[in-house]
């Protein structure tokens, strides 16, 4: 199964999620229906194990949530209510961080009222209030509407801030309502640090053209912080595919745990370690270049990857068949090429966890994704699933 998935990754061309199609006639249907059904049963009887890897805040847990939405009927009202403290904490941490950075960045508040609201927020503990009382809500609303706080937010790449800060603060009036129940979108944007290992099991329908029935998947999520990565090896055994998430938007940010380290550089370094790890050498590797929507917003706001990766300038000078690309397109291609270069470089085995000397024949399958976009993730995962099933049939020499 592992090698079959690997071959299928090499055979299928990488396409952006936005242009994917998933018509059943993409796959051959000339075999006898009963033969297809028997072969599909062989696939169904094997649980496909997928491991999510990547740095912290790259979107791994959001993918787990999407699998639940798409394949396990989403969240009950009780489960939604259980997310309220997490969302409150996201809001509290965001406004607290913004207020705390005003002095550091030398930004003034727009009014004396905002200054008083800032003093109130700074007097509170780091944990969010259990209930959104009127006084707290008034101060948060005042601060988020302050021109100084907005200027601070525009420089949020200079300090740690949740990607979802703007989303939650923009929706604060709705969220602070006493009858609030989190929406699916709220849950997808919520953030809680992953520690340890979590797992989700779900079943996905198999197309009728491939025998019908269902395929079972197990997906594992592990913490992406540096101090959590030593736990990863615990789930390497039996993994048939690795989904490696890398955040395209983090080219101008530094790590929370190491402010001297660029986040994208850290992600590339981690990808190299995963690529060279001998325990994952037979697993298919799929890369989700995630959060490209945030990356595009940053570029429109005047941020440029060349300020953090000087080699980008030479990359853009390379001859291309189509020179009509905008800066966002070039940036996406540049980040992807960084990953491709890693997969093509020869390397020596420096530790027992690395594969042997030589140039690996493995190839990756790349997708640009927005993990909070259910439609995008549905299309991407549908395509990956069909590849797995199609290759299992074709590997038997019948196509």
From Swiss-Prot:
G2 motif, as annotated region: 186-194
Sites where the protein binds GTP: 54-61, 188-194, 221-225, 290-293, 371
Biological process (GO), any one: adenylate cyclase-activating dopamine receptor signaling pathway
GO annotations of cellular component type: cytoplasm; heterotrimeric G-protein complex
Region (G3 motif): 217-226
Tissue: During embryogenesis, expressed primarily in the developing gut and transiently in the amnioserosa.
Gene Ontology terms for molecular function: G protein-coupled receptor binding; G-protein beta/gamma-subunit complex binding; GTP binding; GTPase activity; metal ion binding
Renumbered residue ranges of the record's region G1 motif: 49-62
Region (G5 motif): 369-374
Protein name as catalogued: Guanine nucleotide-binding protein G(f) subunit alpha
Gene: Galphaf
